[in-house]
Structures are given as structure tokens and as C-alpha cells.
Amino acid sequence: MMKFLTYIHVYLIQAILNFLPFCWIDVFYDNQTYIGNQLHHPIYLFLWAFSSAIGFYYYSKKIWEKYNVNYIKKNHALICLGMILSCSIPYNDITLLKDLHVWLSILFVAWFILEWFLYIPVHLNKNSILFFINIGLSFVFTFMFGHITGFCEIYFSFTTNILLHHWMFQD
């Protein structure tokens, strides 16, 4: 039953949540927080962040358990909760708080990537190489567009969840 639910999560829920921005914004310029704050769809933004972070949390956890990787459970949970929190902070006109959501998002995503860099060398295989390529492409898209766009966020969220999901069930 859990396997079925993970397929629903990745290939239905994630697909829908990552398709919707293409209908609402220019994904190559605007980002997900624009949808939540300026277009007044905070529930969408929360669901997208929650769905992405739950996938990152659960699939990573299962992979590390499968390979007996000794990871810090509290750090991993904090990282994924931080991703959700960063998307829950509204825009603010106060200069010091204006970009807080951006910096928190960057911090927690970078921490997630760093966490994987620490654990991947333990079991370097085809999946970890794909994971490195995926992260590299995420950076390329960010530099190509000059900032973090909806496309960059969608790409990282969707492809990372797909790769982790596939890796989790691979023997």
C-alpha cells in the first residue's frame, strides 16, 4: 500500500503541483513565492513546499536505511521542515525581512544537497551519478536565468523526487 501511495505522490500529486505554475506565471522569470504572495495562492505554495519536502524527507530516509547509511535523523527532519517554513514566510516591506524567505530557502536546500554530498560517496553508483547531474543542471538553470525562477524550483523539486523515488525501489 505504501509503495502505491509513493507512486501517487510522485507521479500524480507532484506532477499536478509542478504543472500549475506554467498556467499562472512566466516560470522563466517569476518564482513559486510570487504565486503564493502576489497572486494570493498561499495554500498552493504550502502544498507544493510540503509535498516536495515530504518526498525529500521520506525517500532520502528510506534510501539511507536501505544502504545502512548512518545519517543524523534530527538534522534531516529539520532541513525538510525548514524548506516548508521558508515557503510559508510572506513578503515583507521591512528591508531586513524582505528576502528572508529566499535566504532560508537557499540555506535549507543547500543543506539538503550538502547532506547528500556527505552520504553519497558511501555508495557511489549510477543513481548517485544521476543525482549529481540533477543538482548540476539545477545550478546551470539558475545561472542561465540569472536568478532562482519557478522553472528552477519546479525542476529541482520534481526531478529530485523522481530520482529519489526510483532509487528507493531499485534493488
PLM regions: where:
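N-terminal topogenic module of multi-pass integral membrane proteins
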Residues: 1-69
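Membrane-proximal intracellular helices of multi-pass ion channels
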Residues: 70-78, 82-84, 88-91, 145-151, ...
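Membrane-helix interface and helix-disruption motif detector
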Residues: 34-44, 91-105, 144-154
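Membrane-proximal helix-loop-helix units in multi-pass membrane proteins
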Residues: 76-131
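Juxtamembrane "helix-exit" motif on the non-cytosolic side of transmembrane helices
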Residues: 62-64, 87-96, 120, 140-148
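Membrane-interfacial loop-to-transmembrane alpha-helix junctions, especially the N-terminal start
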Residues: 4-11, 67-79, 123-133
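Terminal transmembrane helical module of multi-pass membrane proteins
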Residues: 123-171
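Hydrophobic cores of alpha-helical transmembrane segments in multi-pass inner/ER membrane proteins
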Residues: 11-18, 45-59, 107-118, 156-171
